């Protein structure tokens, strides 16, 4: 019975209980009405939906013809630069903070936002985490190294050798930008990147046949987490017939670059 319970719990199939334990009203009632609320997978599904809706409403998730930093012609674009209001940047920070807690808990690190779009993400995430009791420093890089005043390549917190850093980015396509970030990280000897968080995992090939995020993980030795992935976006879009063309274009693109 215990094995069946665990099996059905993770498959989200409660029919087993409604038949075998139909005479136990309290047990059936708890599984029918309480279980979906308390199991994390249900909460996460609604959380992903809310995030995708947020990306669309804020103009961050766009469909059309775009060119990624890697040079690829892409049918959808994630542009954190469209986060233009205090309300939206605060909300974005809350989503990243939720992902941070979900994946690495209350680990003490420094947040790094690559210029330019990662800067506001790092600030917003730091604020959101602080509201939940985790006060993390943040910093970002200059595009041009400053040779006067405080100088250096970084603005904000100055990480020291041995400290752990978490990178917060908007998206990884082929991994071009994150590799540039890792070159910048080398300017501080002994710094350790603990993880990287992005809005969307596009599930695309990197330099080879593997997914870009998998390549990054293998190349640099840290995990890359996303709030949602392209499969979540496709599933969300397929619920509305008006999105049929966008879905087809994404799927066609993935026939070439999907990992």
Give residue ranges: language-model regions.
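PRPP-associated nucleotide enzymes
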Residues: 2, 8-168, 176-259
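Active-site-proximal mixed secondary-structure blocks
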Residues: 173
